Amino acid sequence: MTEATTHITIQQKYRSLLKSCKNLISAEDIRLVRKAFDTAMSSEANSQAVTEKDIHRLLDTGLIITSEIGLGRTSIICLMLHRAIESGMLKLEQVKTTFGEKVVQILAGLRDISHIYATHRVVDSENFRKLLLSFAEDVRVQLIFLAEKLYDLRHAESLPPEQQRELVRETSYIYIPFAHRLGLYNIKSEMEDLALRYGEPEVYKEISLKLEGTREAREKYINEFIAPIVDEFNNRGIKFKVKWRTKTIASILNKMRKKQVEFEEIYDIFAVRFILDSRGAEEKADCWRAYSIVADKYTPNPQQLRDWISVPKSNG
């Protein structure tokens, strides 16, 4: 990769970060984020030279925070500044004048939680997990920390095996339960898969190869499965979108171990969702109407049936 190409990539990531930041609406907001970025990159804020890898890490983690977790300007500013605060190269008093009290509070939380993390190395301790998950008053502290760990997991293949194992232990005991607690189910599922990939690489590879080997037949089966429902929904004038996905490797392995069966004996390895476009007052009736159509086409399994219409999940 040439220097020019790298420069363009960094600029593109920075612009993408600004676009994905939902509450970035004014020129002043953009100025503050740019100020935080420039501060993070400056020699005065770093004990050693900033590398291209450092910049990509910062921007990629920022995109996780905005695009995948849904946080905004304040969290991005804190992400950009907290390493300099943690190293002592930048003081909270210096930050307060430019960025305000809320940024200082979150940065103080990040500094303290990093200290706890560095001084409590027994990550599979229940006391440590409770301490870390309940420490900060502002949940954005923990969400920023979570985003950094997700970045580490996504790039764990470059780590030595012992560091990979340590990251897997942390992920299993701390970050997966935390993501679940906050309803970040996509992040939770990805972390479970990545923890399995580096924690049990042979098992992960075996299931991955089997999924790939059955992909074409599975896609054909799913298309045939949803076709009669789609036709009936259209005939009834139901507005909807349909999405389907193969379940995660970690989820499949959990089923195999729970039921003590082989991969070939797991039949529900994909999930289909019909998302209705309904008005609030008609939503419940439309859901029951849709369920009736599906039940007419395919016999429900009472043991696997969950009534989220009458008793919705706590996260809605």
Regions found by a protein language model. Name each.
Residues 2-6, 10-25, 35-36, 42-49, ...:
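Nucleic-acid processing machinery
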Residues 20-36, 92-102:
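Short, mixed-charge amphipathic alpha-helical segments
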Residues 75-80, 145:
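Short alpha-helical catalytic segment bearing the HExxH-like zincin motif
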Residues 78, 107-108, 191, 245:
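Proline- and acidic/polar-enriched loop/turn elements at helix boundaries
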Residues 80-109, 184:
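Hydrophobic or amphipathic alpha-helical targeting/insertion segments
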Residues 112:
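Aromatic/histidine-rich interaction motifs
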